[in-house]
Regions:
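AMP-binding/adenylate-forming core of the ANL superfamily
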Residues: 102-130, 136, 189-191
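AMP-binding/adenylate-forming catalytic core of the ANL superfamily
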Residues: 126-211
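AMP-binding/adenylate-forming
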Residues: 1-31, 69
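Gly/Ser/Thr-rich phosphate-binding loop
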Residues: 34-90
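Alpha-helix/helix-capping structural signal
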Residues: 27, 51-52, 142
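Beta-strand->loop->alpha-helix junctions that form or flank phosphate-binding loops
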Residues: 69-76, 95-96, 175-178
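Ser/Thr-glycine-rich phosphate-binding loops at phosphate-binding pockets of nucleotides
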Residues: 25, 73-77, 125, 149
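Residue-level signal for inorganic ion chemistry
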Residues: 22-25, 46, 103, 127, ...
Length: 218
């Protein structure tokens, strides 16, 4: 049976029955977890797409029974072409290809997708990635988000994953500002009015010297 619901930030708030399969955006999953967390356990299999799943949401998903997957895809591929298990048994750091799809990298280390059943040509993305094998990859970040600081290329998304354990229910992100010496300097923005104790020592344990933010904004 197909269950139809109105578009909503919490599409299962009125749901009382078990659901075999559902699809949501990260924003919707966050809303469900904040408003009615027990409802999520009504879903057996959940795919999450439309935007990246950040480390804070992924940590919350470890507490639910639902089998959660992050999907990877784009308009050019028509639908998602890879999935990553986010929790439970077989949780993975890597996206795994759906059948008949393979991956490679271009000269900029961006993902190139081979989909012979959809197109005779490959699909080149702006997603910097690491190839595990021809059918799996690790997503690093967007090429246009790279911070070039003194000739060192830093990926904000990768750094955010590294330090996620320092932030509990606090949103944060890396960005950059112009710098006369470095070209760009790495900055960390924390969405909080209060400073976080032992943050500096925590960052030094998790980041290499060249990955340390030059400025921290609250």
């Amino acid at each position: 049976d197909l269950i139809s619901v109105k578009p909503s930030s919490n599409p299962i708030i009125d749901c009382v029955q078990s659901i075999n399969f559902a699809a949501m955006t990260p924003m919707q999953v966050n809303t469900v977890l904040n408003q009615s967390p027990d409802k999520l356990n009504l879903i057996e299999q959940l795919i999450i797409g439309g935007a990246p799943v950040n480390s804070l949401l992924e940590s919350k998903l470890q507490e639910v029974k639902t089998h959660c997957y992050s999907t990877y895809g784009m308009t050019e591929s028509i639908t998602h072409i890879a999935v990553k298990k986010l929790n439970g048994e077989y949780k993975s750091k890597y996206f795994e290809a759906l059948p008949n799809i393979t991956f490679q990298l271009n000269k900029d280390d961006c993902l190139v997708i081979n989909t012979p059943h959809l197109s005779n040509s490959t699909i080149t993305t702006n997603d910097v990635s690491k190839i595990i094998n021809k059918e799996s990859f690790k997503w690093i970040g967007r090429l246009n988000n790279i911070v070039n600081s003194g000739g060192i290329k830093l990926h904000p998304e990768e750094l955010e994953t590294k330090i996620s354990d320092l932030f509990h229910n606090t949103r944060f992100f890396f960005s950059s500002l112009p710098d006369e010496l470095l070209g760009e300097r790495l900055v960390l923005v924390i969405e909080s009015k209060n400073s976080i104790s032992d943050l500096d020592s925590g960052l030094k344990k998790l980041l290499d010297t060249f990955e340390m933010p030059k400025t921290i904004f609250y």
